[in-house]
Swiss-Prot record:
Identification of the protein by name: Leucine--tRNA ligase
Pfam families registered for this protein in UniProt: Anticodon_1, tRNA-synt_1, tRNA-synt_1_2, tRNA-synt_1g
Gene name of the record: leuS
Substrates-to-products reaction catalysed: tRNA(Leu) + L-leucine + ATP = L-leucyl-tRNA(Leu) + AMP + diphosphate
Top-level taxon: Bacteria
UniProt xrefs under HAMAP family: Leu_tRNA_synth_B
């Protein structure tokens, strides 16, 4: 047995260099074996990896190493999501060019990622800011343009007059730009959009085929697409109250059954009817201007106070010409949804109820819960949105809500106004086309030219890529491409006249919406994909990333795959067969006496029984241990991966990341847990060496028979192999590690039993036991190799004397006969309460099990001398006795 400690600092870089020297993780596209594509969401090159990256990439690496050992042709690439605003901010703040800042960061982060020991094919490395990548993105933009999947349209946008850029709704906070603090203006601008709505129904339907995606992710996408069936109703307007002879107001509703509960109409501030009414109404114009300064994120609108302005316009109820409904401009109605107008039924919609309570419009309940007396059913502060029977609804009274919807639809479809039906059935989607225009320098240029004679002219493909100029300055707000003295000035490729380039660049979500396809053949200079290779390697078998990307990134990637199929670049619809969203790495917080935050490195933790006490290392002052939260620089509860790897080694960090929690849940970082992982690594090293020593005298050939001790050990080894294999395939990594720990204990026990005399030489062991100990050590090394690959390589060659690399070894074959249990232990309940356990032969029949159960003293005592009335046996699960 070796007394030498395992030295991770020496071993890890040595094995990483050997993997690189032999290029063992490089994937060949012409490999005839079945492929397996595992991919983690590629990182933004911010300059440093964080501990969350270590977890994310370790999860994928375990899968990649396991599937490679199972004989698959594994594709496990890495690249950089390299365009984006932080590079421009760095240019402004640090006076460094975005390109230089980005590539410096890539160099630093690549070194860090290599130190984790990831089995990546670095030969396929891509950076989205590389013209060799984005020239193909520009080509696909032109393909989409020809196919009607990209177009230019006027859109209402949020304009930051200080930063001089368009802001997403989520970037407007209390009516101000999130970065500049300037009051945001609502403008109409020409924007490039991708027509994702052409695939609305298809994107929705296909969610049902993604059975290896988390249910919560599919639900989030389903809600974002937002399919709803309803009626488009044309409300007539009272001509005496409307401006410019406006005659009707169209609304889309999913609840036509509640029409008799209507108390008001509401339109968006930028609805054409609102704009027309405001021309001669300064107060209304002021209210609309105020609405335009509020936040436009849906979450902010939902929580803001509901405000409205009565336009004086009156809409006529479609079932009662004498029933006039006031038309309000309301701050909670968005022009982008439906028709930008609603009818308000306050009794059955909380938002509408809050509104009418504010303005004293009252409410009329029209759906009464089953069993409730309609005469006593009233609504005050809480709307009722459940099922029931119709009341206060004339010809609908007594119907179910569904029957009432159908009746309203039939009646209004049958009525006409101006040769058009008053209502028609419609399917509406919440999903809107994807606006990709960004007024930023550091992004993929949009390959079009604006000519005063020819309008919009695509850049000829022979002139791609349209590259970014490097001699730009950031000394004034706005897009540096607009300010460049020469870059945007070109000749029109169609007429030869003077023209200008498009200075908007693409949303960075475009860059990450197809990178997975480029990885299949990043060397193809003439096309975005090599179709035959892409169709063979895609879809990605296992995609891994944070749930924060559950909607936009995944939805845009699903659209892009379909658009690439429509333009001949791919042959499939879905990009990711399996999707896994890992939890975050969190850490407790520490607050100093002065109210500031202390980092974990500044704090000493002392444990006294169940109590933990924290003090500052430098002063000894007490520190308040706060809540466990997401790691953030502001609260200084971050952990530097370099420090952990430098102190303990990458394998320790990898093991800890996998062992503490199920991978879809948050893992709480603790120094004690990391130290425990480091101790276990040393234990494995000692255990493998001891087992290897004990197995040195083992015969080359498998013994014909095995004694009891050898057979027990072999069953433990193959049972662990089976459970770890299943655990990795099910992504139950923490369970795998628990099984490895359990098997390590069983191997240690077997070694202890084999030493009847501690000084006895290994050659004195029985051949079957010696062979079984060596087999067990080999299996142990192989099942922990996906998690601790460096330690596994060291054990494989130095301790076990194996040739080659464990990273290239085939996964051990499970012997099914060794998985058959000789006996099973079943819990025993009497009258629903557990009273004990019974161990019986695994092939025991019900009579034998019943006899063994009734012989238990605990069962006899629970029955109190009475006969059991019934014994229920759930095979291999539980025995229930009814007394």
């Amino acid at each position: 047995m070796t007394s030498e400690r395992y030295n991770a600092r020496d071993a890890e870089p040595r094995w990483q260099a050997e993997w690189d020297r032999q290029a063992i993780f490089a994937t060949k596209n012409d490999d005839p074996r079945e492929k397996y594509y595992v991919l983690e969401m590629f990182p933004y090159p911010s300059g440093r990896i964080h501990i969350g990256h270590v977890r994310n990439y370790t999860l994928g690496d375990v899968i990649a190493r396991y599937m490679r050992a199972r004989g698959y042709n594994v594709l496990h690439p890495m690249g950089w999501d390299a365009f984006g605003l932080p590079a421009e901010n760095a240019a402004i703040e640090r006076k460094i060019a975005p390109k230089a800042w980005t590539y410096d960061n890539i160099k630093a982060m690549k070194k860090q990622l290599r130190s984790i020991g990831l089995s990546l094919d670095w030969s396929r490395e891509i950076a989205t800011c590389d013209p060799a990548y984005y020239k193909h993105q520009q080509k696909m933009f032109l393909d989409f343009l020809r196919a009607g999947l990209a177009e230019r349209e006027k859109r209402k946008i949020n304009w930051d007059p200080v930063d001089m850029t368009v802001l997403a709704n989520e970037q407007v906070i209390d009516g101000r730009g999130w970065r500049s603090g300037a009051v945001v203006e609502q403008r109409e601008m020409n924007q490039w959009v991708f027509k994702i709505t052409k695939f609305s129904q298809e994107l929705l339907d296909a969610l049902g085929t993604l059975d290896r995606w988390p249910d919560k992710v599919r639900l989030m996408q389903r809600n974002w697409i937002g399919r709803s069936e309803g009626l488009l109703i044309r409300f007539a307007l009272d001509a005496t109250t409307t401006p410019n002879n406006e005659s009707e107001l169209k609304i889309f509703t999913t609840r036509p059954d509640t029409l008799f509960g209507a108390r008001f109409m509401a339109i968006a501030p930028d609805h054409p009817l609102a704009q027309a009414a405001a021309k001669d109404n300064p107060a209304l114009a002021g209210f609309i201007a105020e609405c335009k300064q509020r936040g436009t994120a849906q979450a902010e609108i939902d929580t803001a106070e509901k405000m409205g302005f009565d336009t004086g316009i009156r809409a006529i109820h479609p079932f009662d010409a004498a029933w006039a409904l006031p038309v309000y401009v309301a701050n909670f109605i968005l022009m982008e949804y439906g028709t930008g107008a609603i009818f308000g039924c306050p009794a059955h919609d909380q938002r509408d109820l809050d509104f009418v309570n504010k303005y004293g419009l009252g409410n009329t309940p029209v759906v009464c819960p089953e069993g409730q007396d309609p005469a006593s059913f009233v609504i005050t502060d809480t709307a009722y949105d459940g099922d029931g029977r119709m009341i206060n609804s004339r010809f609908l009274d007594g119907m179910s809500a569904d029957a009432a919807k159908e009746e309203v639809a039939k009646r209004l479809e049958g009525e006409t106004r101006g040769n058009e039906p008053v209502a028609e059935r419609k399917v509406n989607f919440r999903l809107r086309d994807w606006g990709i225009s960004r007024q930023r320098y550091w992004g993929c240029p949009i390959p079009v030219i604006h000519c005063p004679n020819c309008d919009v002219v695509p850049v000829p493909e022979k002139d791609l890529p349209v590259t970014l100029p490097e001699d730009v300055t950031f000394d004034r707000p706005g897009n540096a491409l607009d300010h460049h003295p020469t870059w945007k000035h070109v000749d029109c490729p169609k007429c030869g006249g003077k023209a200008t380039r498009e200075t908007d660049t693409m949303d960075t979500f475009v860059d990450s919406s197809w990178y997975f396809a480029r990885f299949t053949d990043p060397w193809n200079d003439s096309a975005p994909t090599t179709r035959e290779v892409a169709d063979r390697m895609l879809p990605v078998d296992q995609y891994i990333g944070g749930v924060e990307h559950a909607i936009l990134h995944l939805l845009y990637s699903r659209f892009f795959t379909r658009a690439m199929k429509a333009t001949g670049h791919l042959g499939m619809d879905e990009p990711f067969k399996g999707m896994f969203t890992q939890g975050m790495v969190v850490h407790e917080t520490y607050r100093k006496p002065d109210g500031g935050w202390a980092s974990p490195e500044e704090v000493r933790i002392e444990v006294d029984g169940n109590n933990r006490r924290a003090t500052l290392i430098t002063t000894g002052e007490p520190v308040e241990i706060g809540a466990v939260e997401k790691m953030s620089k502001s609260k200084r509860n971050t952990v530097d991966p370099d420090d952990i790897i430098g102190s303990y080694g990458a394998d320790t960090a990898r093991w800890f990341m996998l062992s503490d929690s199920p991978p879809d849940r948050d893992v709480i970082w603790s120094e004690e847990g990391v130290q425990g992982a480091a101790r276990f690594m040393q234990r494995l090293w000692r255990l493998v060496n001891e087992a290897a020593d004990a197995g040195k005298a083992a015969p080359q050939d498998r013994p014909a028979t095995f004694g009891s001790d050898a057979l027990t050990l072999r069953k433990a080894a193959h049972g662990a192999l089976d459970r770890v294999s299943t655990g990795i395939e099910r992504l139950h990594f923490n369970v795998c590690l628990a099984n490895i720990r359990e098997f390590a204990n069983e191997l240690a026990d077997a070694l202890a039993r084999s030493r009847s005399n501690k000084s006895a030489p290994a050659r004195d062991l029985a051949p079957d036991l010696s062979w079984s100990l060596r087999e067990a050590a080999i299996i142990l090394v192989q099942i922990f190799s996906p998690m601790m690959p460096h330690l596994a390589e060291e054990c494989w060659q130095r301790a076990l004397g194996q040739t080659g690399l464990v990273s290239q070894a085939r996964w051990p074959q499970i012997e099914p006969d060794l998985l058959i249990e000789d006996s099973i232990t079943l819990p025993v309940q009497v009258n629903g309460k557990k009273r004990g356990e019974v161990t019986v032969a695994s092939d025991a029949g019900n009579p034998e099990i019943e006899a063994a159960v009734l012989a238990l003293d605990a069962v006899k005592q629970a029955l109190g001398g009475k006969q059991a009335r019934k014994i229920i046996i759930v095979p291999r699960r539980i025995v229930s006795v009814v007394g």
